[in-house]
């Protein structure tokens, strides 16, 4: 595990502020938005569809804290781009938007360095003000939209209106208090992690923040490598994973197979009270990865000789299956959902940090074993040569 302190020179212009929103392309945006609201505690924020004059794509925008998800579906049968994307990837993340300053400068620099500009900068406006956008291509079929608000005061973005329907169930459910996006993880095919992470360093002037390799993260069967890149202010963190060769198919390779290539593996959502958050998410019916009791026995033993004092009750953490990782400075608490759709691709993480800026490397081996148990149930913990997603099936 390596932490990098050299951020490189501070960019003169074109600051990346924070994650703006995450856009999902799904088969049924209305149902997907309802699922995230009912199960994860989001609330409807905005809408764009036939009723607002959007004739091709419907978008349901949901929000919790500062976390914004946009669920999009095609309205017409001839939308080949979205149709092909769904056949290949299934429901999942299409775009990760960053709020920025000086969008034009960022695009100009990215273009000079060889980045693919999917859409050149353009401006949209309504009665609440103007917003400038641009779209860049990153790994797989994933894109990054740059969002520069020009005195914009609307609820989301131009073209969106208030939700058309108020779900009377949502106020009766326990609040989950998820606050911000902590990080977003991208999975790559083997040998593509370096080039994917280098894209951010070269084109967006991000820097390496953290890394781990397969000598540190492995089980009897499988392993991974990971590099985390971040913007200068480190308000945006993007781990990039790849599978490493092992005896069996790793959960990273399983993702790549079912996603049809690289894509967003999981989104980590931060809370300041993970115990209450997870209690309420479980009450709402969310499913999480199981953790064996042996993990907590070993954790209790190791913490006896650690300088770190975990404030939370260990019995409660064990009851809720929340993981703990720590170093000499602090600790973090984390838990992972099961996949959010039928394909074993995208899932979510809930994380709470106590003076700890890592990514749970101490839990990677335990997590891999938990993932492998789920893989085995799906029939996917197999020799690499004998199993895969077969075309035409």
Curated annotation (Swiss-Prot):
Gene3D superfamilies in the cross-refs: 2,3-Dihydroxybiphenyl 1,2-Dioxygenase, domain 1
Specify the pathway. Amino-acid degradation; L-phenylalanine degradation; acetoacetate and fumarate from L-phenylalanine: step 3/6
Gene behind the chain? Hpd
* Alphabetized GO MF terms: 4-hydroxyphenylpyruvate dioxygenase activity; iron ion binding; protein homodimerization activity
Zinc is among the record's keywords: no
Per the UniProt entry, what is one GO biological process? L-phenylalanine catabolic process
Assembly and partners? Homodimer.
Fetch the PROSITE patterns from UniProt: VOC (PS51819)
What does the record say about how the cofactor binds?
Binds 1 Fe cation per subunit.
Q: Which InterPro entries match?
A: 4OHPhenylPyrv_dOase (IPR005956), 4OHPhenylPyrv_dOase_C (IPR041735), 4OHPhenylPyrv_dOase_N (IPR041736), Glyas_Bleomycin-R_OHBP_Dase (IPR029068), Glyas_Fos-R_dOase_dom (IPR004360), VOC (IPR037523)
Chief site of localization: cytoplasm
Cellular component terms, GO, for this chain's entry?
endoplasmic reticulum; endoplasmic reticulum membrane; Golgi apparatus; Golgi membrane
Q: What is this protein called?
A: 4-hydroxyphenylpyruvate dioxygenase
Q: Which residues carry this modification: N-acetylthreonine?
A: 2
Its UniProt entry gives the catalysed reaction(s) as: 3-(4-hydroxyphenyl)pyruvate + O2 = homogentisate + CO2
Binding of Fe cation: at which residues? 183, 266, 349
In the record, what lineage is assigned to the organism producing the protein?
Answer: Eukaryota, Metazoa, Chordata, Craniata, Vertebrata
């Amino acid at each position: 595990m390596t932490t990098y302190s050299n951020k490189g020179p501070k960019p003169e212009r074109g600051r990346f502020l924070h994650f703006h929103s995450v856009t999902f392309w799904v088969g049924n945006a209305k149902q997907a938005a309802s699922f995230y609201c009912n199960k994860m505690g989001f609330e409807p924020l905005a809408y764009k569809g036939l009723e607002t004059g959007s004739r091709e794509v419907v978008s349901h925008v949901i929000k919790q804290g500062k976390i914004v998800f946009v669920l999009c579906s095609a309205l017409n049968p001839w939308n080949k781009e979205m149709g092909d994307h769904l056949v290949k990837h299934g429901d999942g993340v299409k775009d990760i938007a960053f709020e920025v300053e000086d969008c034009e400068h960022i695009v100009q620099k990215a273009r000079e360095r060889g980045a693919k500009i999917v859409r050149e900068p353009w401006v949209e406006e309504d009665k609440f003000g103007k917003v400038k956008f641009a779209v860049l291509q990153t790994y797989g079929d994933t894109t990054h939209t740059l969002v520069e608000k020009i005195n914009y005061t609307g609820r989301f973005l131009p073209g969106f209106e208030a939700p058309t329907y108020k779900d009377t169930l949502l106020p009766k459910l326990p609040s989950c208090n998820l606050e911000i996006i902590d990080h977003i993880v991208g999975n790559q095919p083997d040998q593509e992690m370096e080039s994917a992470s280098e894209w951010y360093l070269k084109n967006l002037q991000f820097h390496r923040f953290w890394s781990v390799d397969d000598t540190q993260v492995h089980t009897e069967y499988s392993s991974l490598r990971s590099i985390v890149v971040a913007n200068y202010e480190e308000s945006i963190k993007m781990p990039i994973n790849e599978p490493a060769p092992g005896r069996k198919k790793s959960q990273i390779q399983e993702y790549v197979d079912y996603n049809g290539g690289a894509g967003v593996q999981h989104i980590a959502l931060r809370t300041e009270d993970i115990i209450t958050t997870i209690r309420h998410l479980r009450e709402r019916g969310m499913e999480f990865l199981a953790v064996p009791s042996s993990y907590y026995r070993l954790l209790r033993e190791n913490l006896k000789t650690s300088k770190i004092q975990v404030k939370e009750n260990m019995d409660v953490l064990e009851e809720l299956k929340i993981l703990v990782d720590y170093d000499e400075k602090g600790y973090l608490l984390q838990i992972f959902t099961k996949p959010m759709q039928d394909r074993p691709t995208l899932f979510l993480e809930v994380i709470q940090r106590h003076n700890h800026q890592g990514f749970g490397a101490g839990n990677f081996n335990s997590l891999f074993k938990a993932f492998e148990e789920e893989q085995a149930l799906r029939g996917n913990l197999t020799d690499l040569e004998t199993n895969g997603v077969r075309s035409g099936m």
